[in-house]
Amino acid sequence: MNTNSIKRQTYLSPLLFLCCVVIGVTQSKAQQAPTEKDMSAYLMVFHNDDTHSLHMALSHDGYTFTALNDGNSIIAGDTIADQKGIRDPHIYRGPEGAFYLAMTDLHIYAQQAGYRDAEWEREDYGWGNNRGLVLMKSPDLIHWKRANLRLDNQAPFFQDIGCAWAPETTFDEEAGKLMIYFTMRHHTDAAKLYYAYVNDDFDRLESTPQILFEYPDEKITALDADITKVGDKYRMFYVSHDGVAGIKQAVSDRANGGYTFDPRWYDPEPQACEAPNVWKRIGEEKWVLMYDCYGQSVHNFGFSETTDFVNFQNLGQFNQGIMKTTNFTSPKHGAVIHLTKAETDKLIEKWGL
């Protein structure tokens, strides 16, 4: 054996080891999500009935929100959805720091907009029938990768689904996987809540959808689930159609089931509301329950605040109390996450505020 070769190998090995360590540390840092102490702003995503597109708004204090792009859409629904429109956007920051957008592939005014000949995609499948979701993943909220997911293709049992609505994402710590959950009904039956695991690329399911929660009376629809882990409990707020549509809460020790029914109504609204979303105030032990007040003539978001998930203070609706908007009205089905200053600055640089 060539002794020069031996010396060269001996000399290079420590360098290779050091490179591997540096790369490993760099990857570890890149995959570590920022913590609450790093956060300085709030990002709200929502859709608009006029555009059926994704909109975003920012707030530095959690009380006053300003829409990006002067209130215009950030991502046009007709560029990403099979039905040429999206509804019910939800945003989630994964444990590795990436952002996950999940949306309903549905345009309820597609006929008027000239996207289809009939009012709905299929006859005899009821209001707002659809079969798909739009899933998007981004490292920075600017560059997005998209997948269109058809739920009726997941198993023979799902071929007759009447809707797939309001998808949301969370991380199941026990399974160590991303989990999406959504509203689904068969034909025109009462809707129930389902979940499935999704791959890291956020473009395909890794399990067949299973029941997450159904109302005790199976003839009553349960929809629009929103799961938040607080302490060691998973708190799921959802919509019940047990009378006037409103918000109820169910609690479990795990993400993917076991939720205990609570008959109490948690919203203070006299008219129908839907789309609950819970978000925490930065640096405080306070959580905001936000919901879409759709049963009134002018749609709006309503807000209630809690420290213990038992007692809730009614904060009123946008521009009727302490919660304000500056340049948009009638948002639909929203969700809120925290952002760092750097992430906020990048969004403002891209879209303007």
Describe the role of every protein-language-model region:
Residues 1-34:
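Bacterial Sec-dependent N-terminal signal peptides
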Residues 31-353:
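Carbohydrate-active catalytic/glycan-binding domains of CAZyme proteins
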